[in-house]
């Protein structure tokens, strides 16, 4: 079975039950809703549709809400756009005006107070580059370093700067509460720069923080520099290479990607590699060779999940994109020696759950087991076993439907919903039967079972047992 999970962004190209069904069958594990676009009414229709489809197929499809996050944008031009030449003078202002070829308003009222002479302003995915030459009251006077066409409402970025805009906007607050009300499984938090950003999100979530997992989107230098602190407050990260590639030199992206994947894997945090993975499939039925290698390299690095954005949201071939990504991942995984990696990687073993999870994976390799069955209420033990990237298939057993869905994003895990067990004997019997039914085991095949003896108590992992079919 494929170990690397696939996240798909839902948009006009796939927002119908037939296409969503085909995408799930092709390999979609998590459906992502981008709240930078659309209304709550539109998103509710999509969520209800996803719930109907997953119920019909009886699959643990998880739903991810991706927040808009703190954004900095220019406002509108009188004629919709202007063309700026290299060397032109141009002004950004916090005054509310209609833009022209000399000046345009910005959305953040405190911008002039926070920028300095010599700072860089990038627009339109860094295609347009401005240098601040002076600041006069509300006006930020710039020189155009790299010109081009600039149109309404383009986003702005400021490499090397951390601005003081409030992290959780009213829009994000409303979206988060909407997601809680409609039972989303993950919230992806945009432009996370420090752990306080996540604490602010958790304050909005209240008690729901224990039911919805937080994914920190790493999109700027500050987020990269603060990754250790950020990982203490999140359940995983997304390497959002689009905005990250604007903020930092593009030649550093592959190095940062590999470092972040390795860090999260060792910490037991899920890690998503995202942006432009199969970008050409927005228009073409097949990927480029470079895109194929990009997906494969993320899989080689051990990413938990790979993500499709415009390919499924707005592309001509959403189902084909999912199928292509799944086939690349599976073929790559066949050529990775996970047993050797397990033996040579130095893991941090900090507590009994870590130790038992590590021992479980080692025992499964030594005994040539076919399946590791992990029984977990919250999914924590399953995620800890997953982080060791075992060559043996992992079956994540849980009585909780929410956990069942969230395990869909854990590397190497096949989520299985089970009934409550009353004793270890019942647990072992259920694990064996579920493994036989799920993986087609035969007489003589071994299963390693791990979990906790106390029914219904999270974080009580304290046993390992070897079961043999037959």
Annotate each language-model stretch with its function.
Residues 1-470:
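Non-catalytic helical/linker scaffolds that mediate oligomerization, partner binding
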